[in-house]
């Protein structure tokens, strides 16, 4: 499951379609444009692809931890965490703040 999700994200590379389709399709679908813009702005898209391809182990673990306990109210935050849990967490926080 973790590898599959990471594969989708890594292959997607953009962290837009893949991100919304795999980890938090329900929650991310609503904020797909915002999350996509933020991801592209911060370069998380490219980083996500590289990290997804190179580090499947921490991504899978990070995705589960962030998605479940890290940011329950912000699904896209968890999804970005899956892309690159260290930067993803910050991204999720920033996104949440800006959106609010």
From Swiss-Prot:
<dbReference type="GO" id="GO:0005576">
    <property type="term" value="C:extracellular region"/>
</dbReference>
<comment type="subunit">
    <text>The polymeric elastin chains are cross-linked together into an extensible 3D network. Forms a ternary complex with BGN and MFAP2. Interacts with MFAP2 via divalent cations (calcium &gt; magnesium &gt; manganese) in a dose-dependent and saturating manner. Interacts with FBLN5 and FBN1. Forms a ternary complex with FBN1 and FBLN2 or FBLN5. Interacts with MFAP4 in a Ca (2+)-dependent manner; this interaction promotes ELN self-assembly. Interacts with EFEMP2 with moderate affinity.</text>
</comment>
<keyword id="KW-0379">Hydroxylation</keyword>
<keyword id="KW-0272">Extracellular matrix</keyword>
<keyword id="KW-1015">Disulfide bond</keyword>
<comment type="similarity">
    <text>Belongs to the elastin family.</text>
</comment>
<keyword id="KW-0964">Secreted</keyword>
<feature type="modified residue" description="4-hydroxyproline">
    <location>
        <position position="72"/>
    </location>
</feature>
<feature type="disulfide bond">
    <location>
        <begin position="90"/>
        <end position="95"/>
    </location>
</feature>
<keyword id="KW-0677">Repeat</keyword>
<feature type="modified residue" description="4-hydroxyproline">
    <location>
        <position position="86"/>
    </location>
</feature>
<comment type="function">
    <text>Major structural protein of tissues such as aorta and nuchal ligament, which must expand rapidly and recover completely. Molecular determinant of the late arterial morphogenesis, stabilizing arterial structure by regulating proliferation and organization of vascular smooth muscle.</text>
</comment>
<protein>
    <recommendedName>
        <fullName>Elastin</fullName>
    </recommendedName>
</protein>
């Amino acid at each position: 499951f973790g590898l599959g999700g990471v594969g989708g994200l890594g292959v997607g590379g953009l962290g837009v379609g893949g991100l919304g389709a795999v980890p938090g399709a329900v929650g991310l679908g609503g904020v797909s444009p915002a999350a996509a813009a933020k991801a592209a702005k911060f370069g998380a898209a490219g980083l996500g692809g590289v990290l997804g391809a190179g580090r499947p182990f921490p991504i899978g673990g990070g995705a589960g931890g962030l998605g479940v306990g890290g940011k329950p109210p912000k699904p896209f935050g968890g999804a970005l965490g899956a892309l690159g849990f260290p930067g993803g967490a910050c991204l999720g926080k920033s996104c949440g703040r800006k959106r609010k």
